[in-house]
């Protein structure tokens, strides 16, 4: 079984050990976030809060040990590339802090780190990388032009139940005024997946060709 270093299921992470071990984690310190969406502070603080929120979820605690290590790794890495994408811009006359495409870039970084530093086997590596890439989807799926297609397509790449857990922890691990509204969006994501037969599993198709066309 693959395990994430310095993490033991059922115990709080050793944050100091993780910071010493991983430069990419230490890099998150002092990377700013917009205070309207992340009043808790920098990316380092947020990442720790997300991981600790994840560990408290009953649905996370019900997973097997391998799945817990996969999700913990995804939580650690979900904002890894905010360090390289964060910038200030003016929006409607107000300065905002944004991190465009951090999830897309983070997927590639996560895959590389999991191969070079963490010796994750292929299936584990891809599961984590895709969780990083899609971690924001449960928050925005309902606003997509075609929400059904969005969740079905996601289910072909990632376990949507695990994705919802990561998104829930991401929301609980921040301080913002619209937290309950965002959590409702995650509930709607689950309903959308259930209605389209892709909650916690890949949507099945009548044939491989049908899946390819989709």
Which residue ranges define each predicted feature?
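Generic local-structure boundary detector
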Residues: 33-39, 48, 54-55, 82, ...
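Divalent metal-dependent catalytic cores for phosphoryl transfer on phosphate-bearing substrates
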Residues: 59-177
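A sequence-level detector of short, solvent-exposed, charge-rich linear segments
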Residues: 44, 95, 125, 133, ...
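Charged substrate- and nucleic-acid-binding regions of tRNA-handling and nucleotidyl-transfer enzymes
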Residues: 1, 61, 157-167, 171-214
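Exposed alpha-helical structural elements
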Residues: 3, 14-27, 49, 123, ...
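Charged/polar, low-hydrophobicity segments characteristic of intrinsically disordered regions
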Residues: 6-9, 114, 142-147, 198-212
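Acidic/His-rich, divalent-metal-binding segments that scaffold phosphate/diphosphate chemistry
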Residues: 1-97
């Amino acid at each position: 079984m693959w395990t994430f270093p310095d993490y033991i299921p059922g115990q709080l992470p050793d944050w100091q050990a993780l910071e010493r071990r991983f430069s990419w984690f230490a890099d998150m310190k002092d990377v700013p976030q917009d205070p309207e969406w992340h009043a808790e502070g920098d990316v380092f603080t947020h990442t720790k809060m997300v991981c600790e929120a994840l560990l408290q979820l009953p649905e996370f605690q019900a997973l097997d040990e391998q799945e817990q290590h996969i999700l913990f790794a995804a939580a650690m890495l979900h904002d890894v590339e905010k360090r390289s994408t964060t910038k200030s811009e003016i929006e409607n006359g107000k300065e905002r802090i944004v991190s465009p495409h951090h999830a897309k870039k983070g997927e590639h970084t996560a895959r590389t780190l999991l191969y070079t530093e963490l010796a994750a086997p292929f299936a584990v590596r891809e599961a984590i990388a895709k969780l990083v890439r899609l971690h924001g989807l449960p928050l925005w799926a309902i606003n997509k032009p075609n929400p059904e297609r969005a969740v079905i397509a996601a289910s072909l790449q990632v376990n949507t139940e695990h994705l919802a857990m990561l998104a829930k922890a991401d929301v609980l691990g921040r301080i913002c005024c619209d937290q309950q509204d965002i959590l409702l969006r995650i509930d709607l994501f689950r309903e959308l997946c259930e209605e389209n037969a892709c909650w916690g599993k890949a949507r099945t198709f009548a044939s491989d060709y049908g899946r390819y066309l989709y």
